[in-house]
Structures are given as structure tokens and as C-alpha cells.
């Protein structure tokens, strides 16, 4: 287990996330951030971002709810997890262990991007831990990963692929390209947050190795098999989908709304995939209304 300490830009977390601590789980350790009181909301990020993704959403929720965010080993984390399974089922297991260790369940589970796949798996495996679920634009069905990002799987398998990827992410101009973060958000991501997303894989080999294993585990069989369980999850589901998403089609929101027994769609205007970056207030309003039973 290794904690990054070589570059302060890679370890920065926004204070708006709340109190930080290291949570020791059976499968490994990760950082959690806790703010507010009331019914718990657990916010799950996706690939090559971290808890900072929710930095503008948490303050909007924490006046009425307990908001917990975590750094999953998606490549922008600080504690490496060399012995921990980090394929989608393994990541879902970490979320399940977090809910149990923090006594959060049943929780409102919120996922974005590939974090949405993790949430789908948690809901399928342990519905008793999930009171309701919010899926923002995310992978589903055969769209895992989106074709634009298929090169990431190749980078994880060819010699020096991860080193080249990590070196490229040091440069903000590269991050702004469509094949990086460029088309994931409409707004330019705050430099401090962007550095915290991109630099961990660049400065620490152990984090890079974790990301390699995550990328190798991206497989449509996980989303296909999970989709077969949607009909069995009878808790409320909100699909807070971005209207301007370039990777996750609106048709998938409609399909998921039909496949989950108690699901509805709420469109987030003006947002691309990373709606917590583009439209945090609108997303937070939708989550609050849904969690309070008004949506």
C-alpha cells in the first residue's frame, strides 16, 4: 500500500467535501469524506477522477443530508491497492464494504460515468443496502467503455502504454482533447481538480498499476449481465441524464427507465457526461428532490 506524497497537486482535495479519513476495509484502505447529517447519500465517481468530482454538489446536499464521497481506485486515488480486485465487481465490493463499515445502509447511491456501473452492480448484489439510486450519464448495456475510449484498454495491454498515457496527462492541453476530458465536460475543469485527476498516474507507479488493472477489467459482459438484473431492483431509480452527453446516448436513459421497475428520467440541460462539473446545482436539486420523495 502506497500513499502519494511527491506532488501536492496530485493529493489535493477540496475542503467542501467535508472531514477526511482513511477507511480500512477488508479489501484495502481508501479515503472517505463526510459532511452533513441526516439520511446518507453516497456519491460514486468514475474513471480517472476522484471525490473532487462532487466538490460543488456536496455543499448543495449537506444542508439536509449526510454526504459521503470516496476515492475509488479508478486511477486518481492516493492509496494504491495492489492486492484488491479492481474489475467492476471488485469495485462494487469496495462500495459495499464502505456502506457496511460506515453503517450507511440503506443509502441513496449516486453514480456518474463508470461509477454508474459500480452502482448498478451494488444495487444488483446488495439491494438491501440501497434505499434509492441516482444514475447520471453512465455506461450501460453494450456501451462499456464508449468507443472513443477503447484505446485505454489497448494502453493497458501494450508495453509502455500506461507510461505514455501517464506522461501525456501531465499536460493540460492534452487533457482538453476529446479523447481525454475534453468532451466529458462543457466547462473547463478547474485546474486544481484537473491536476488531482490526471497527475496521480503520472507521479506514482503503484497508482498507474492500479489503473492498468482497472482498464483491463473493462468488459461489456459486466454491463450486459447487470442489465439482466434491472427488473429485480424494485427501489426508486432516478436517471439524471445529461442532455448534451457525447458518449452516453439518451436512448439508454429511456431504455433503463423501462427496464427498472420504478424509474424516471430527469434531464440535466447544458451538461455533458461530467454533470457534477458542468451543472452541479441542477444535479444537486434533482438529487434533493428525489431523495426527499418529491421527484
PLM regions and their residue ranges:
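Flexible "cap/lid" subdomain of the alpha/beta-hydrolase fold that forms the substrate-access gate
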Residues: 2-10, 14-21, 30, 68, ...
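Alpha-helical elements of the RecA-like P-loop NTPase motor core of helicases
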Residues: 52-55, 209, 285
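Conserved HGGG/HGGXW glycine-rich cap/lid loop of the alpha/beta-hydrolase fold
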Residues: 33-77
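Catalytic histidine-centered segment of alpha/beta-hydrolase-like enzymes
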Residues: 271-280, 284
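Conserved alpha/beta-hydrolase "nucleophile elbow" surrounding the catalytic nucleophile
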Residues: 47, 111-113
Amino acid at each position: 500500500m502506497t500513499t502519494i506524497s511527491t506532488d501536492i497537486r496530485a493529493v489535493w482535495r477540496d475542503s467542501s467535501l467535508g472531514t477526511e479519513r482513511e477507511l480500512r476495509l477488508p479489501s484495502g484502505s481508501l479515503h472517505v469524506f463526510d459532511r452533513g447529517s441526516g439520511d446518507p447519500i453516497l456519491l460514486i465517481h468514475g474513471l480517472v477522477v476522484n471525490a473532487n468530482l462532487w466538490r460543488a454538489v456536496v455543499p448543495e446536499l449537506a444542508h439536509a443530508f449526510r454526504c459521503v464521497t470516496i476515492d475509488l481506485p479508478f486511477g486518481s486515488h492516493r492509496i494504491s491497492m495492489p492486492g484488491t480486485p479492481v474489475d467492476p465487481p471488485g469495485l462494487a465490493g469496495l462500495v459495499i464494504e464502505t456502506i457496511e463499515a460506515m453503517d450507511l445502509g440503506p443509502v441513496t447511491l449516486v453514480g456518474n460515468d463508470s461509477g454508474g456501473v459500480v452502482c448498478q452492480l451494488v444495487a444488483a448484489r446488495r439491494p438491501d443496502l440501497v434505499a434509492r439510486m441516482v444514475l447520471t450519464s453512465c455506461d450501460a448495456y453494450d456501451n462499456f467503455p464508449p468507443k472513443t475510449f477503447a484505446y485505454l484498454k489497448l494502453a493497458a495491454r501494450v508495453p509502455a502504454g500506461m507510461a505514455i498515457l501517464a506522461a501525456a496527462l501531465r499536460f493540460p492541453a492534452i487533457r482538453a482533447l476529446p479523447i481525454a476530458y475534453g468532451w466529458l465536460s462543457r466547462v473547463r475543469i478547474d485546474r486544481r481538480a484537473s491536476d488531482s485527476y490526471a497527475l496521480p498516474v503520472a507521479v506514482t507507479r503503484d497508482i498507474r498499476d492500479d489503473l492498468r488493472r482497472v482498464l483491463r477489467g473493462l468488459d461489456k459482459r459486466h454491463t450486459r449481465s447487470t442489465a439482466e438484473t434491472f427488473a429485480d431492483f424494485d427501489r426508486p431509480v432516478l436517471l439524471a441524464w445529461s442532455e448534451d452527453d457525447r458518449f452516453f446516448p439518451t436512448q439508454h436513459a429511456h431504455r433503463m427507465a423501462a427496464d427498472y421497475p420504478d424509474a424516471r428520467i430527469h434531464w440535466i440541460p447544458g451538461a455533458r457526461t461530467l454533470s457534477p462539473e458542468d451543472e452541479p446545482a441542477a444535479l444537486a436539486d434533482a438529487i434533493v428532490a428525489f431523495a426527499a420523495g418529491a421527484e
